[in-house]
Amino acid sequence: MSLTTVTELTPECPSIASAEVCYLVDDDPSVRKSISRLLESEGFNVRAFGEPEAFLNHMATNPVRLVVLDIWMERMTGMEVLAHLCARSPETRVIFITGHEDRAAEATVMQAGASAFFIKPFDNEKFIAAVREALNQA
């Protein structure tokens, strides 16, 4: 199981009550690291998983308000993870990320209830704004 936990709250970001937890599922370690750092710099706690199955096992016993989810992973696609989320935890907000421009996949996941869809590399400010908006809706 690949799990990275980032628990520091930055003092510049007191508006996030008790440091919101953002879950991140991506099979690329460098992407997990960079997005974890970005979210951490904005005051979020990050729980990052390299394997979708490990995330699904974790969420079976832990509430998840928001997950940032890679759409194309080797063992299970983000769309398959979304199907599990819709069945188990329909209130969970999902932001999809991908390294490949795929408008059909974007349309599919947005229609299925995703909060946002970003193609890597993405604008950090827009991404953080989407994270905050998704958490406000959760």
Give each language-model segment a name:
Residues 69-70:
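Active-site T/S-Asp motif of two-component receiver
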Residues 120:
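A Lys-centered signature of the CheY-like receiver
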Residues 73:
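Receiver (REC) domain active-site loop signature in two-component systems and cognate sites
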Residues 80, 101-116:
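Alpha4 helix (beta4-alpha4-beta5 surface) of REC/receiver domains from two-component response regulators
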Residues 48-66:
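Acidic, metal-coordinating helix/loop segments flanking the phosphotransfer/catalytic sites
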Residues 1-23, 29-36, 125-138:
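Non-catalytic signal-transmission and effector/linker regions of two-component phosphorelay proteins
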Residues 50-51, 77-80:
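Acidic catalytic/metal-coordinating carboxylates
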